[in-house]
Amino acid sequence: MDDFRDYEYLARPAATGDRHLKSCEIRETAALIAASRAPQATPTNGEETRHAEVWPLSFTKGLPHDSDGFVDPKAFHAFVTAITEPDRPGLPHAFDVPLGPQAGLAPGGNTPYSYKPRPEYALGWRCTRRDGAPLTVRAWESPRAGHVYDLQGADASDIAMDAAPALGSEELTAEMAEVYALALLRDVPFSEISAGGTAFAPAGLSAHAAFTGLGRLAFLNARTVLDGLTPRQADRRAARFDQTGAFTPQTMFRGSTPGAQTGPYLSQFLLVGTGTCPQETREGLISYGANTIDQRVASLAPGVDHMVDFNSWFDVQMGADIKDLQTADAGRRFITTPRQLASYVRVDQLYQAYLNAALVLLVQGAGFDSGFPEGTGKSRAAFATFGGPHMLALISEVSSRALKAVRRQKFNIHRRGRPERLAAMVDKVASGAPGKLTTAMRAQLRTMYLNLDKAGLMAPVAAHNAAQLATHAARDGSYPLTGLGHEAALSHLLPMAFIEGSPMHPSYGAGHATVAGACVTVLKAFFEMFTTPDGWTERLMDSVGLGCSVEPNVVADGAKVDFDRSGTKLVDATDQTRLTIQGELDKLAANIAIGRDMAGVHFYTDYYESLRLGERMAVTILQEQMLTYPEPVSMRFVSYDGDRVLIEGTGHAVSVTIFGKNGRPVDYAAWLSRAAQAPVPA
């Protein structure tokens, strides 16, 4: 509990001068709350130091690399220095770092005056655009955002994340296996994945085979005892299992909360629209004032993956900007497959999914938290305060702050490489061309490869990549890149949904997941999640006219999905488990975050830890905003870890009270720092 009753301010008449003083007192109290949060030491996995000068799993994208794909140490050191060095007051930061190929400056690239690359790093592009346009270079996205401050909520240094899984760990092997499996299941319907079926295997792997193979891995096999896990690692492992402690098709690729593991894979908030009857909500059209939002999405073309050869992989690591070459499918459909969800999270706006969910709940009459002073009585309606405008604005407020907070983790602390990089290191060991990898690195990567092969993933990945290369070559000149490495027909590179690969920022934490964690926390805090004002029984989706779960239709032509006729309408879901509003909101956060894993650009831990970072950013903002209300206000929700969280304001003080899943009180400061190593000494 965090209680600021010592900083009470006196009630005064509403005279102009007195109001000004009271406003200042409130701001001072908010500053005291902010000062009470101890800066947290975020632990790292130590690989940037342990693997120095090689950095097989660090984020090196955009920097000069040698012909084997290893970064120039001089450029990497310059990159880290440019990220971490303090600002100079009154002067802009040049961020003068080598960017892109150094064999002749590519459009958008950069060669600092002080940087003189050795010949092995002065390389050019390997591929060319078929349309004849020059390949250009992408810039890093907000690499200095970790130095920016905010005036609401915890500072970016006050909330920590756990260390990312390290090379050699069972956890890293498991989450690399998940990303490989998702790449091969991109065109398999979610309903088939949740059922663990065998009907569809367009890339050589069925949902059942994926489940069986993943279950062979120690981290995902509940019967295997793993010694030496930290409590945090044990929590992440337990999140892969159901309530009985089993790994099942229903938990495979799902989020870490009970709601995310219940019912159909996709949250109803990604599918349904608004309306007064099921026939209307199944149209998937959301009322947005005088406009309408259609839940159908434009998708990437099915069956087309990228970066399956070393040449295109290499150019992407050098920062090639080829996003405009992505092939799209015709028409719009309801999200039916992992590729379609990946398509959504490639182009979605920052808080789009949560805005849509908020609109659905608003129009369907979900009602706000019973602890609000407006909206529940006869004479005061909620609008500017505790109403729709208040809540919708708050979603955007927390989203931007969450995004800046996770940028500090990404660039300033972890600098974790993307899955596409780890897969390339696995491929190097598998192909017998390890390059600069040390003996210890080779041994760890070899063990990972053998475990991935035991899971039944390496052979179908190699076969799929070979088939993709052959298809790209046979497309009558329509594939947008030339110069692909067709000689590497058995690569174990990660097939990517996006032609440009991952974004130009590190993997850990994940921006989508952090924003999801923050925005869904606001939705759970603002809308009434429970059946009674003093109870914790969750409200069902029935209460907002969405009781019958739906999923997109799937039309099959033998063992193939007919994508032209699938996803055209919503039908009754096979799984009709009764769903709760809070559970579907938690599932929405998981869908958006793990949708990035389906594209191949993130790991599971990126989702898990970032979700909780965003949640804490939102709670600290809500805590401070409680000071601005001159009368009693409260809001409550269940956290992603299952804690019961109550935020209260009395009109002159604020408190945050938390009870864990076991019913015992949890210290608020300890809750905020749950992922931290230890508080930073003052």
Model-based region annotation:
Residues 1-682:
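Hydrophobic alpha-helical bundle signature of multipass membrane enzymes
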